[in-house]
């Protein structure tokens, strides 16, 4: 049975999500930050982690953005195949929600209309939107504002199959080491392995939205996530890049089938302000 959803409802939810995600960190991230502060071995590192927690508290209480970089708006939109939209074009409705959220929420407008000419759009649109069709009659929207301090430190490696699992590990560790303090650690490391050039990048981006306390359902991948987190935290980059035992809070890896001649690996790094909001309509 077809279910009709008014796109005005999409716009309203998008607006609220833009404001919510930029002022409040998800519970799993807050818990991870507290745990990191308790376990950090460096006194300076511990002090920095406590300051970051204080920043989160002030942001929520005073409705000030957690970070001045309120990001480029990234959405994953899962649309039930039994959904019919009425109103304006869905993509316009999403961008209108971003426009309203970033304007009414007094969030920084960080998007330029052309990558070379660099004129600001003044409303943080257009958003980056990834659509997928799923069974059912609901729409699930995941919003992830992505700051570019960490985005600029992200990498894609087109490995050869012969590079194998060791090549994958080395690629991930290389990306984190190269990022160093520039990604505002402690980091959240999203990894995509497989697919094609663009698919592995989307896998890595989606990995950043997975809750910190959830590992991959594939046993060997879950083991790899734990192993890499341990190795990354032995690099000594630490909170704020000033040394310590907490360089990353989590490593999330998504995989996908790939071509017999390829082994694509994407590493999408996020800072400690790994913001996201999810709503189902």
Q: What annotation goes with each model-predicted range?
A:
Residues 1-191, 196-281:
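Non-transmembrane, aqueous-exposed alpha-helical and coiled segments at domain scale
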